[in-house]
Amino acid sequence: MLSKFSAATLLSTGLSIPASCRLIILLAALSVVGFHAGHAAPPPAAQPLALTPPMGWNDWAHYQCGINEQIILDNASALVKTGLAARGYSTVTIDDCWMLKDRDAAGNLQADPVRFPHGMKYVADAVHHLGLKFGIYEDSGSTTCAEFAGSGWPKGGGSDHFIQDASLFASWGVDYLKLDGCNVYVYFASEGPAAYRKAYDEEHVALKNTGRPIVFSESAPAYFEFSPEWYDVLTWVRNFGQLWREGDDIATYSAKTPDQPRFASVLWNYAYNLPLGRFQKPGNWNDPDFIIAGDPGMSLAESRSQLALWSMMSAPLILSSDVGKLNPDALAILGNRRVIAIDQDPLGQMATLVERKPGMDLLLKPLKDGDYAVAVLNRSEAPLEVIIDPVALGFASASGCTFDAENLWSGERTFTLTTLNADIAPHDTAIWSIHTHTACGEPTRTGAIVMTTDKPHGSIDGYAHCLAATGAVEECAGTPEQTWTFTEEGALDSAQGCLSAVDGKPALKPCSGADAQQHWNYTLSGNLVNASNNLCLTNASPSATGQPLTVQACGHNQLNQIWSLPN
């Protein structure tokens, strides 16, 4: 859960201190009142955590601060009774507002005695008794987003509580920690990333030293969303936790406006998450926020779309709804074993955006067993008829490529197909698993190459533009000129030739594996660096369309040099 203040506001918290203090970043004291120094050493060969995307339930998107002990335990019981726990939704996490604003005399967090009269150890034990895991929320700042006691150092500096709180959580039996990023004290705004890194590193070490395996969900990237620092933070969070929120919250439910549509929020979170596949691998997951499928404000078609899209992105599947009130159709969607298996596939690779045109996205995801998942999202308000040729997915263009397909919603299987055909309702998503035959070969890394704009918080079409063989970035239209193959040699191959760096300008030339001008190195930061001159493929600005591209000296997180390629 994110504060609704901007990152700049969050990072200016300490500016009331005179500039003459010249504090860089306050170091938290190691001593903590009332805490003893003995810690169990972590197991010498601890097993990696969250090798598949975490699944479970969290209260926030449905209840916000309106939680109590009974609500948490009722939802935990409902996960078991509905069969969702058996499908993998097995971690129950309490979000913000569970604690008091003040700590006790020993400096420990205190559960709100009105909301949780039996305390957190009781709730954790009850959840464990159901065969589930227990998660809890805290904040890396001085207070949580809802202004309750946080784990971080106070405004103006002082001791933090990361070690003390981690020890307390372990004593309660916590299996999962969500650490938010509101109210982190930073003296100079430019030092924000370093302050966040310090906080999350300290929490990582504190959790490790408890000796208890606790999955660590970080929120730091979300507080730098769309800024140049975003990519730095996305790079280092992988060293500390297993998953991270990297952008806007999903729309929450309100009893005052229960039928308020929420699908636009789902599409937006999908939009900002999809281009970040390069940061993800087993044990490290981008988290576009909660699954609200089946909750008020989501139709059945929209619910299918969210589960399908999150599964194609290998995203965490963390429900946030009143589980006991989910109707049978919603339960059937959320409990669909075939779609969940796509999400939980051990390869853990995010889908490639094969094609984007107004109202439609086509996605391809490789699976560990050699099969593939294919999904088509209908973003429009009209029915959509699709016919997908395997060549469009990167398979061999020679005749004879056939495949078997399973419709993952219906379970229907068809054999020896030459195309995938579907009629897709508005806001719905068709999803299949396909098994190709020998003539298809291995698919190439084929799809759209996109640049995200500097005008976020809008539509999918406005957020990302597509590289075209014209030598410019254009609005995505799904044309052959916007389809690229990133070859094993590092060439960017279009139907009209390979992108080359010639005299400081990109140009299409006949493909030649020996031509260094056609070799591009793709970095984790998103740069396309030409092997002949070590210069970066550059747009006039992140939002520019129709303007000639150039190759220029690579800047640090320069937004008009950051690209998302087929995975």
Tell me what each language-model feature is.
Residues A41-E69, L73, A78:
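N-terminal module-boundary/linker segments of secreted carbohydrate-active enzymes
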Residues T438-N567:
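Lectin-like carbohydrate-binding module/patch detector with strong preference for beta-trefoil
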Residues N75-A189:
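Aromatic-lined carbohydrate-binding/catalytic grooves of carbohydrate-active enzymes
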